[in-house]
Amino acid sequence: MHFLDENIQIKIDKFYKKNSLDKNRVIVAFSGGADSTALLLNLKYYLSNNVIAFYFAHFIRSDNEQNQEIEHVKGFCDLYNIALQIKKCDIDIKSESARLGVSIEELARKFRYIALENALKENGANYIALAHNENDQIETIIMRFFQGSFLDGLSGIPSVNRNIIRPLLEVSRLEIENFLSLNNIGFFVDSTNAQNLYLRNRVRNNLLPAIKKVFKGYEKCLKRISEFSKEFADYFGKDEFFPVEKGKYYYSFDLKTFLDFPKYLVFRLIFKILNSEGIAAKVSYKALNEAFKVEINRKKNNVLLKTNDFFLEKRHNKINLIFKRDEKFYKPFDFILEVGKWHSLSLGKILLKYLECNAASVSRLKCCSYEFRYKFFKDRLKAKKFFSKFIRCNPAYLMLLALDNRLIGIIDLNTLNLVWSEKSILKKINISLIGGLLKE
C-alpha cells in the first residue's frame, strides 16, 4: 500500500523507538471507525503485515447497525488482506449494567478488554494496540479534571501500559481524517458518535466547542499539564514514601504516619494499591474522603469504608486495607488443630504455629466455623448478642477456638487477626493460612 501522508508512519516509528518496543505480532482493536482504521493500516505497513485485527461486538446498539458494522469490518479486512477475528459478547450488557449499577460504557469496555487479553494469549502476540489519539487524550484530561482526579489522572491516557500500546496518542484527529481522505479509505461511522448518550460524547460535542471559544490554544496547555502530572506521578512512584506492611490479603499502615501524611499522598497510595488489585474504578474519591471524616484518631476500633471487594479499618494503632477472599468453595468445618500440623479447609491450608494458654500443656484446640456457634451457649439470645459484636466480619471467615468445650477465641481467617479472646485462658496464638482455593 502506498501512503500519500507519511506523517503518521513517522510518529509511529518514533513511538516504537521511544518506548523500546519490538516489532512482533500485535492485536489491533478494530471497530471499523476512522481511528482504528488508520491505526490498523499504518501498523500493517509498519510491522510488515504482522497484525491481527480484533473486532468485539457489544450489541449495545441496534442489531441492524451492529451487523452492518460487522459486514464492513469483514469486507475491509478482506480488501486489505488482514487477518481478522470477531468475538460477539455473550452477556446482555445493558441489563447487566443495570443490575450491577455501573454504566453501559464502563461494562462494555471491561468485556472488550477481557476479550482482547484472551486474543493476545491465543495468538501469541506481544501487544494490544488501541487507537486513542491526541484528541482523545485532551478529552480524557478534561473529564478527569471535572471529576476531581488526582495528578495521576491528569497525566492522561498512558501510551504504554504493560502489554497495551497506543501508537496514535501524538496523532490528531485531523491528521487521521486527512490520511483517510488522501488515500480514499472508507470507514464505518458509529451512529452514537453524534449523540450525547455517553460522557465523552457530551464533552466532545458540547464542552470542547465552548472551551475553544474562550481559551485559544488550550490543547497545548493541557498537554503541558499532562506532562508535568506524569513527571510528578513517576517521581512519587519510584520510592515508597509511605511505610507499608504488606501481607497476602492486606496492607497495613502505621496510624500516626497515616494521619500526619498529606491526605493527597495517602489517597494516592490507596488508589495505587486498589488499582493493582484491579478494583480502583469501583471506589470514588468522594467515598474515600467521607471515610476519613470519621474521628479516626479516637481509641475505638472502627470500619472506615466497606465494599464488596475490601474494607478499610482502624484497629488499635494501625490502618488496615483488607481484601476479601473467594467464598465460592466455602464449606463449614469442625476439627482439632494441633501445634505444628497442617489442616486442609475449603478456604485453604491452616497451620497452628504457636499457642500459649494458661496451662502449659495445651497444644491443640477445637476449631469450628460460625455455623457451630450455638453449641457454646445455653441461650441462643445470648449467643446472638455476643456475636453481634463481630458484625463487621464476614461469618464465612470466622474460626471459633475452643478448649474443653469452652469458647476461648475467634480468628478472622480473612485477616488472620484474633478478633476476640478469653484473655484469662488464651494468651497468644499464631496461625498461618496458605494455598487452598483462595483467590490469589
From Swiss-Prot:
Keyword Coiled coil: no
Binding residues annotated for ATP, in chain numbering: 31-36
BP GO annotations: tRNA modification
Localisation: Cytoplasm
Gene3D superfamilies listed in its UniProt record: HUPs
Swiss-Prot/TrEMBL keywords: ATP-binding, Cytoplasm, Ligase, Nucleotide-binding, tRNA processing
Single GO cellular component term: cytoplasm
Catalytic reactions on record: cytidine(34) in tRNA(Ile2) + L-lysine + ATP = lysidine(34) in tRNA(Ile2) + AMP + diphosphate + H(+)
Pfam family name, one: ATP_bind_3
The enzyme's E.C. designation: 6.3.4.19
SUPFAM superfamilies: Adenine nucleotide alpha hydrolases-like
GO terms of molecular function: ATP binding; tRNA(Ile)-lysidine synthase activity
Family statement drawn from the similarity comment of this UniProt entry: Belongs to the tRNA(Ile)-lysidine synthase family.
Functional note: Ligates lysine onto the cytidine present at position 34 of the AUA codon-specific tRNA(Ile) that contains the anticodon CAU, in an ATP-dependent manner. Cytidine is converted to lysidine, thus changing the amino acid specificity of the tRNA from methionine to isoleucine.
NCBIfam families xrefs: lysidine_TilS_N (TIGR02432)
Domain remark from Swiss-Prot or TrEMBL: The N-terminal region contains the highly conserved SGGXDS motif, predicted to be a P-loop motif involved in ATP binding.
Protein name: tRNA(Ile)-lysidine synthase
Organism: Borreliella burgdorferi (strain ATCC 35210 / DSM 4680 / CIP 102532 / B31) (Borrelia burgdorferi)
Protein encoded by which gene: tilS
